[in-house]
């Protein structure tokens, strides 16, 4: 298939097929590996996997040697150790096409915590390929010391958690958290916070209503007690004095006083 075969240059002569297979692990299914002395070929089932391998593995170390990875071409290129091969499978896609293509996003997302600031997204992606096929990786965005890795399958995600959680990258042990679980935790926390706030609001409202009803009942009882005290209060002294004076000036008392004064005047006349 056109575009599925890649060339490995500057290959260590001691490299075996297992070493090459391990080197390309996580980049898709491999159909064939053909090793020569100092170079070799790897054929993928999907040309997109070949593009990923060329873009991301060129210049990496394989068996203590920095190898060159590029698409297999029909014409020979001398002067750089590749003039001895010719391949009938030629790549029609330029090498820079993959850089402009958007990454494949999936729901099989891992959150990487405690990530060293020296680790780039490329380093993180290369590290996570030990567990499976990585489709997307990012580092320190939007949060520093935190990365995101997405896998092609959920099985690769679980494999990464089991094998790579707690491993060191640049001197720091990383912690892997499944993205869906972390999202659900944040949702549950926000829901509990809203519930507690609504409960506190309802409690404060009920308390204010109770205090308001109590104050109203107290004011009503006070007004009732005042009205009762006013109705039961004794007659003031002035009114009592007025009543006594009016009683002393009754007609019977006036007649008695007149009769007494007459009897006194008669006794005085008889004495004279």
From Swiss-Prot:
The modification Phosphoserine is found at residues 86, 227, 229, 233, 250, 253. It comes from the Eukaryota. Residues 74-83, 182-229 have a biased composition (Basic residues). One of its GO terms (cellular component) is cytosol. It is found in: Nucleus. The modification N6-acetyllysine is found at residue 167. The keyword RNA-binding applies. Pfam families: RRM_1 (PF00076). Its main location: nucleus. Belongs to the splicing factor SR family. Plays a role in constitutive splicing and can modulate the selection of alternative splice sites. Interacts (via RS domain) with PHF5A (via N-terminus). Found in a pre-mRNA splicing complex with SRSF4/SFRS4, SRSF5/SFRS5, SNRNP70, SNRPA1, SRRM1 and SRRM2. This is Serine/arginine-rich splicing factor 5. The gene is SRSF5.
């Amino acid at each position: 298939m056109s575009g599925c075969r890649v060339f490995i240059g500057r290959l260590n002569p001691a490299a075996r097929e297992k070493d090459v297979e391990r080197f390309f692990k996580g980049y898709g299914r491999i159909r064939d590996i053909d090793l020569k002395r100092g170079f070799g070929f790897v054929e993928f089932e999907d040309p997109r996997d070949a593009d990923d391998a060329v873009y991301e593995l060129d210049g990496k170390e394989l068996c203590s040697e920095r190898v060159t990875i590029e698409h297999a071409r029909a014409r020979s290129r001398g002067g750089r150790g590749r003039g001895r091969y010719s391949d009938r499978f030629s790549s029609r896609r330029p090498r820079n096409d993959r850089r402009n293509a958007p990454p494949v996003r999936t729901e099989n997302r891992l959150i990487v915590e405690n990530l060293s600031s020296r680790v780039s997204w490329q380093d993180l992606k290369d590290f996570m390929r030990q567990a499976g096929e990585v489709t997307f990786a990012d580092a320190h965005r939007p949060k520093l010391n935190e990365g995101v890795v997405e896998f092609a399958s959920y099985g690769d995600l679980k494999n990464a958690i089991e094998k790579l959680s707690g491993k060191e990258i640049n001197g720091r042990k990383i912690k892997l958290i499944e993205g869906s679980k972390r999202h659900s935790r944040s949702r549950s926390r926000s829901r509990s916070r809203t519930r507690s706030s609504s409960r506190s609001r309802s409690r404060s409202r009920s308390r204010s209503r109770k205090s308001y009803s109590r104050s109203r009942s107290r004011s009503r009882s006070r007004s009732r007690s005042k009205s009762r005290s006013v109705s039961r209060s004794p007659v003031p002294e002035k009114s009592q004095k007025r009543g006594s004076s009016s009683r002393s000036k009754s007609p019977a008392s006036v007649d008695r006083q007149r009769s007494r004064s007459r009897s006194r005047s008669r006794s005085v006349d008889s004495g004279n």
